Amino acid sequence: MQEIIPDFLEECEFVDTSLAGDDLFAILESLEGAGEISPTAASTPKDGTTSSKELVKDQDYENSSPKRKKQRLETRKEEDEEEEDGDGEAEEDNKQDGQQKMSHVTVERNRRKQMNEHLTVLRSLMPCFYVKRGDQASIIGGVVEYISELQQVLQSLEAKKQRKTYAEVLSPRVVPSPRPSPPVLSPRKPPLSPRINHHQIHHHLLLPPISPRTPQPTSPYRAIPPQLPLIPQPPLRSYSSLASCSSLGDPPPYSPASSSSSPSVSSNHESSVINELVANSKSALADVEVKFSGANVLLKTVSHKIPGQVMKIIAALEDLALEILQVNINTVDETMLNSFTIKIGIECQLSAEELAQQIQQTFC
C-alpha cells in the first residue's frame, strides 16, 4: 500500500516531493487547512519568498519611477502655483476688505462731524432756555418745542391777517386824501375855552393886544388911546365878542396873569404829551415799556424766562385789535427780552399807559 500511493502521486501533476514521506493523515489535514488560509497568506509563501507578480510590479515601479517623479514634481509645482495664486487673491481680498473698512470709518466720521455742526447751529438759532442739556436728544427736543411755538405764532398772525382782509372787504374804508395826515396818538378831549370874568374883560380893554397883526377897524381888540375917556360897554356884549374871537382862533389879549400862568400850562401840557408818548410799567415779574414812534408803537418787555409768555402777549395784542409788524425774542443768561413793533390805527382808543398796564397783566 505504501508503495502504490507514491507511484500514484508521482504521476499526478501537482506532486510535491517534500511530502513523500509524510503520512496520509497529515496530507489530508494540510488540505483541510488550506481553505482557511487568507488570500494574502496564500499569495506569500511560508518561507518568505516573494511571488512572481510582486517582482514584476516592483520592476515596473523601478522602471517608471523617474516619470512619476517628474509628474509629481510638475503636480507639486502646479499646486504651489495654485497656492501662491490663492495667497495673492487672499491678500488682494484682504486689502480690499481693509480699504472698504477704512472708507466706512471715514464716511461715518464725516457724518458724525456734520451732525455735530448741524446741532451746534440749531442750538445757536433758538433761545438757550429751550435746551437744558447739551446732548443730542435735548437739543432736538428743544428745537421741536421752539418750532411748534413759532408755528402757533404764525397761525395766530395768519388768522389775524385773514380777519383784517375780511373786515376790509365787508366794510371798505374811504380812501384818504393824498395829503399825509398827522398821526393820531390817542384820543383826547378838545381843550376848553378859557373863562373870562368881567374884571379881566375890563383889564383887557385897557391894554393893547400882543398879536403882531395890525388892529383892524372891526377888531374887538382895538387899542383905545389913554387920553380919551373910556366908553362903558355892556359886559354881556363884550363877553360875547371875546368868546366869538376866541372861538375863531384869534390870540388872547396880553395880561400879566395869563403870562405868568402860561409856562406852567405849557409844562403841564408837555408832560402830558410825554406821558402819552412813553409809558413804563414795572413790577416784580417784568418791566414793560411802551413808546409811540410815528404810526407805530414799540413795546419792550424784560422778565425772567417764562415759557409761553410770547404767546400770551400776542394774544393780548390781538384782543386789543392791534397789528403786529415784527417780533424779536432775545435771551441773556436767565433774562428774556421781547420787543414788538405794532401798527396802530385810527380806531385805537388806548393810551401808552393803558397799553403798558394791559401787557403787564399778562405776566400775572
From Swiss-Prot:
One of its GO terms (cellular component) is nucleus. Disruption phenotype: Stomatal defects in cotyledons and hypocotyls. Residues 99-112 are annotated as: Basic motif. PROSITE patterns: BHLH. Keywords: Activator, Developmental protein, DNA-binding, Nucleus, Phosphoprotein, Transcription, Transcription regulation. Residues 99-150 form the bHLH domain. Changing residue 38 to A: Extra divisions outside the stomatal cell lineage and reduced phosphorylation by ASK7. The modification Phosphothreonine is found at residues 40, 44, 214. This is Transcription factor SPEECHLESS. It comes from Arabidopsis thaliana (Mouse-ear cress). The gene is SPCH.
